[in-house]
Amino acid sequence: MYVPEEIIETIKMIEYQNLDIRTTTLGVNLKDCADKDLDLLKENIYNKITSFGGNLVETANKVSQKYGIPIVNKRISVTPIGLIMGSTLKGLSNEEAIDACVEVGITLDNIAKEVGVDFIGGYSALVQKRATPEEKMLIRSIPKLMTKTDRVCASVNVATTKAGINMYAVKKMGEIVKETAEITKDAIGCAKIVVFCNAPEDNPFMAGAFHGPGEGDAVINAGVSGPGVVRAVVEQLKGKDIGTVSDEIKKTAFKITRMGELVGKEVASELGIDFGIVDLSLAPTPAIGDSIANILEAVGLERCGTHGTTAALAMLNDAVKKGGAMASSNVGGLSGAFIPVSEDAGMIEAVEVGALRLEKLEAMTCVCSVGLDMIAVPGKTPASTLSAIMADEMAIGMINKKTTAVRIIPVPGKDVGDSVEYGGLLGTAPIMPVSEFSSEEFIERGGRIPAPIQSLTN
């Protein structure tokens, strides 16, 4: 039985505190699409995705109207393309193989536009130990792909707690990001490339979503968003101890997650597809008041990035997980608090006033959901430095048995003090300083950082 106060509270959350379903993401298995013939492969991919996803947008809009809850994005994730290209690329030269991979990416882009989804993820490779020949070609094709597509997202898993860190892949991804920055406008292509450690197979959020090899034929995963709601709750707790703040955040996360699961299950039911998970992540937007940084400041920090930020974020992340886990038995994905600089108005302000630096962000990633996300750095930053930043973040994920990721943007022609405007959910990225000391010799070593002792769990 709902009481009037609860109904009014929900309306307030949606109307005044930016509560929404950030995404309903359809995951589609493409393993059965593999074929030696490139044209047949593309045809199989088209038929498979459109058969499941042709009505995704229409259905999500219908459910959104039914419950009065905004569903901001409708997305698709697919089986990592690196897993299905082997027979197609056999016997091709390197250039021919790269072009073939790009053609598949263009097919995905065309499908995304036809069915009306915002992004399609899964142009991916899982290379935490070693890369197969087709995965090497797929990785090499990423910069070219980004010049020819608008909605395709690429991700590469270069490390896991069980496998260690593939430093060859880390080195290559620094070069790939650098090349992509140089050939796409304002380095926008880099906003669609993620480097992962311990990548989840059921992540609904872009740019790192892919449909994992252990998933079924099709699934709907939902991602919620509620920083504005949490901030409003925290602002009502002036003078209360941290335990009380944590408890109230937990209760709020419970309500947000319930809503996410309700909508996700309804969309899945309407489409006749299994419901997978609800991702508990608090995902900010550039809108004022819809900020993770502002939550931390409401807890009592003058600015996000000052001493105490990591502790406050740890408390927030843990409270969100506890509340969400109580609300749903189907929790997955990344599930925590996102800290993407360009997509969070409070983070942008913190960088601009000098309160938040790359080193502090790295510390924050030890206790939050993902990693260094939407970080813009000077265009002159060498590829080896980009790789070294990735290696640091992969090490945090590997040792702590958690997902970490890097989405970094070296913007050509920009330096510290400048910013780059992407608009929409990607927001505005202030250029952040990186160390001027070289990591090149370390990165050039290649090889593999062995799996840590905590990987021996059997």
Swiss-Prot record:
Intrachain S-S bonds: none
Pfam families assigned: DUF711 (PF05167)
- Report the domain of life of the source organism: Archaea
SUPFAM superfamilies in the record: PFL-like glycyl radical enzymes
Which PANTHER family does the annotation name? UPF0210 PROTEIN MJ1665, UPF0210 PROTEIN SPR0218
Provide the family line: Belongs to the UPF0210 family.
Q: What is this protein called?
A: UPF0210 protein MmarC7_0672
Organism field: Methanococcus maripaludis (strain C7 / ATCC BAA-1331)
